[in-house]
């Protein structure tokens, strides 16, 4: 069927991309924009751009990934990864309000890491009370004791 054929073709283009054929990223974007292979390639591309400290270009790639994975028929896992990476870039450039905005979709999420990220951004904005609430939610959500301790340290630094 058509979907299977598209998946096979996207897989072949993705494998060529992994072998170093950068023009295949454009082919993936243009010919298979909603394919999981395209999403993986975009995530990989953003990582490479960040390694080269090209944050603006990485943001553009991640925003494209976010847009193509959004919605009812989107890919929620890739969308969440895109949003996390976008938020982390915004945190690193002190664009705290943009970090909070990109994470807003997950404000009721049970993922403690999302609460921790949002708390970091809120702290940067000077919204201490909301940051404390988010850190508390992260602490409650983490089962790993070392992660809890890290967030507890962040919380104690906010309270100083």
Tell me what each language-model feature is.
Residues 51, 92, 124, 157-160:
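Register position in tetratricopeptide repeats
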Residues 132-160:
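Terminal, low-structured helical/coil segments at or just beyond the last alpha-helical repeat
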